[in-house]
From Swiss-Prot:
Its EC number is 4.3.2.1. Keywords: Amino-acid biosynthesis, Arginine biosynthesis, Cytoplasm, Lyase. It is found in: Cytoplasm. It is an enzyme of class 4 (lyase). This is Argininosuccinate lyase. InterPro entries: Arg_succ_lyase_C, Argininosuccinate_lyase, Fumarase/histidase_N, Fumarate_lyase_CS, Fumarate_lyase_fam, Fumarate_lyase_N, L-Aspartase-like. Pathway: Amino-acid biosynthesis; L-arginine biosynthesis; L-arginine from L-ornithine and carbamoyl phosphate: step 3/3.
C-alpha cells in the first residue's frame, strides 16, 4: 500500500519515522474497522442521494468498502503504521482499489467527526453486550437464591456477626446492585446513541448534506446539535467508564466476599475447580484466582477513568491530538468489564453453598441480640433501656464464655424482670430471620416475593 499521506499536500518533507510510529494509532484503533466502513457506506450513499458525488461513484465506493471488510475479516488486510489510523488505512486502500471514486468519499467529512462516529457506533454495540452479560450474572445470582432459599447465614457489619439473614437475601442484594448498573448502562446508551457525523472538522460543512438520512441509515434516533461539541467531547465515553467503574466496584465487593467465604476459616462456599488454581509448592492449596483477579482489575478500570478524565480536563475546543488517547482506556474497560462479567456469571452458577457451615455461623456472635432488645420493647420497655439490658446480658455471656442461647430464664431475669418463657422462641435464628417481614426484609416470604419480582423483570 502506498505510504503517501492523504493530507500531505502542504508538506515538503516526509514525516520523521519515529514521529510516524509515535503518532500512529492503527495498532489499537483497527478494532473500529467495521464501524468505520459502516459509517463510510452510509456517508457515501448520502453524498450520492444529495447529488454531491455521482451515483456510479457511490456504487464503486460501497462495493470497494465491502471488499475491504471481507479482506479484514479474512485476515488479509495489510495495516500500515505509515497511514496512521484505521480511517486512512481504509480510505487509501479504497482509492487504490477503485481509483478516483475512492478519493471522493471524504467529501463533506473530517476525521474529527468520522472518529467520533466510529467510537459511538462501537460503544453502542458494546453497551448492549455489557447489559446482556449483566443479565447473565443476575440470572446466576437468582439461581443461587432459588436453590438455597432457606439457607441461613450471618449478616455482617464491620465483618463481625450482626444479624442472621437468608443467603438468598444476600444474593438479592447484589442483584439490586447489578440492576442499577444495567440502568446506568441503559441511560448512558441514550447519550451515546446520537449521530455526530456532519460536524466536519469543527464548524460543519459547506456541502448540502442530509444528516437525518445518515442517522436513519445508522439507526441513530437523533443527531448532535452543535458541530463544535460533536468533535470536542468524549463525555459519553467517560460516562461509560464511570458506570463501568461502579459496576466493577460491585463485582469487587462480591469477589472479596467469595474469597473470604471460600477460606478454610469460613467454608461458606466452594468455588468450582475450573475457576481456581493451585500452588507450585503447597499441594493442598485451592486458590480463588478468578475473584482475586476481578478484584485487581477493578483498579485497572478506575485507572482508565482517571486517565481519560486527565486527557480531557484542560483541552480547548475543538479537536486536539490528545484525544487519540481516548481509545485505549475505553477499549481496555470494555474488554475488562465483559470478561469479568462473563466469567463471574459462570462461576456463580457453578458455586456450591455449604449450608451447614453458614447455619452454624448464623447463630454465633450473639447474632440475635437485637431480637432480644425488640422482645423487651414489645414487653413495654423503652428501646434504649432494652438496649442497655441486652448489652449487659452479652457482657455476662462473654465473661462466662457462653452465648445468649445458653442463658436460663433465671439468668435472663437478672437483667430485666420483663423476661419470661417466651424469650427462648424469640431468639432462634429462624425466628429472627422470619421476624423481618417487611418489604425488602430477609423473611422468607419477602425474599420469595423479590425473587418473583426479579424474574418478572420488575
Amino acid at each position: 500500500m502506498s505510504q503517501n499521506k492523504l493530507w500531505g499536500g502542504r508538506f515538503t518533507q516526509p514525516t520523521d519515522k519515529f514521529v510516524e510510529e509515535f503518532t500512529a494509532s492503527i495498532d489499537f484503533d483497527k478494532r473500529l474497522y467495521h464501524q468505520d466502513i459502516r459509517g463510510s457506506v452510509a456517508h457515501a450513499r448520502m453524498l450520492g442521494r444529495q447529488g454531491i458525488i455521482p451515483q456510479q461513484d457511490v456504487e464503486q465506493i460501497v462495493h470497494g468498502l465491502k471488499d475491504i471488510l471481507a479482506q479484514i475479516e479474512a485476515g488479509q488486510f495489510d495495516f500500515s503504521v505509515g497511514l496512521e489510523d484505521i480511517h486512512m488505512n481504509i480510505e487509501a486502500r479504497l482509492s487504490q482499489k477503485i481509483g478516483e471514486a475512492g478519493k471522493r468519499l471524504h467529501t463533506g467529512r473530517s476525521r474529527n467527526d468520522q472518529v467520533a462516529l466510529d467510537i459511538r457506533l462501537y460503544l453502542r454495540d458494546e453497551i448492549v453486550e455489557v447489559v446482556a452479560y449483566l443479565d447473565m450474572l443476575i440470572d446466576s445470582l437468582l439461581e443461587q437464591a432459588e436453590k438455597n432459599l432457606e439457607v441461613v447465614m450471618p449478616g455482617f457489619t464491620h465483618l463481625q456477626s450482626a444479624q442472621p439473614i437468608l443467603f438468598s437475601h444476600h444474593m438479592l442484594a447484589y442483584v439490586e446492585m447489578f440492576k442499577r448498573d444495567k440502568g446506568r448502562m441503559d441511560d448512558c446508551l441514550k447519550r451515546v446513541n446520537v449521530l455526530p457525523l456532519g460536524a466536519g472538522a469543527l464548524a460543519g460543512t459547506t456541502f448540502p448534506i442530509d444528516r437525518e438520512y445518515v442517522a436513519e441509515q445508522l439507526d441513530f434516533p437523533a443527531v448532535t446539535r452543535n458541530s463544535l461539541d460533536s468533535v470536542s467531547d468524549r463525555d459519553f465515553a467517560l460516562e461509560f467508564i464511570a458506570a463501568s467503574s461502579i459496576l466493577m466496584m460491585h463485582l469487587s465487593r462480591l469477589s472479596e466476599e467469595l474469597i473470604i467465604w471460600s477460606t478454610s476459616a469460613f467454608r461458606f462456599v466452594d468455588l468450582s475447580d475450573g475457576f481456581c488454581t493451585g500452588s507450585s509448592i503447597m499441594p493442598q492449596k485451592k486458590n480463588p484466582d478468578v475473584p482475586e483477579l476481578v478484584r485487581g482489575k477493578t483498579g485497572r478500570v478506575y485507572g482508565n477513568l482517571m486517565a481519560l478524565l486527565t486527557v480531557m480536563k484542560a483541552l480547548p475546543l475543538a479537536y486536539n491530538k490528545d484525544m487519540q488517547e481516548d481509545k485505549e482506556p475505553l477499549f481496555d474497560t470494555i474488554d475488562t468489564v465483559k470478561g469479568s462479567l462473563k466469567i463471574f456469571a459462570d462461576m456463580i452458577r457453578e458455586m456450591r453453598v455449604n449450608s451447614s457451615s453458614m447455619g452454624r455461623a448464623a447463630g454465633q456472635g450473639f447474632s440475635t441480640a437485637t431480637d432480644v432488645a425488640d422482645y423487651l420493647v414489645r414487653k413495654g420497655l423503652p428501646f434504649r433501656d432494652a438496649h442497655e439490658a441486652v448489652g449487659k446480658a452479652v457482657a455476662y455471656c462473654v465473661e462466662n464464655e457462653m452465648d445468649i442461647i445458653d442463658l436460663s430464664l433465671a439468668e435472663w431475669q437478672l437483667f430485666s424482670p420483663h423476661f419470661s418463657d417466651d424469650i427462648f422462641a424469640a431468639i432462634t435464628v429462624e425466628a429472627s430471620v422470619n421476624a423481618r417481614d417487611v418489604i425488602g426484609g430477609t423473611a422468607r416470604n419477602r425474599v420469595e416475593d423479590e425473587i418473583r419480582r426479579c424474574r418478572e423483570g420488575k
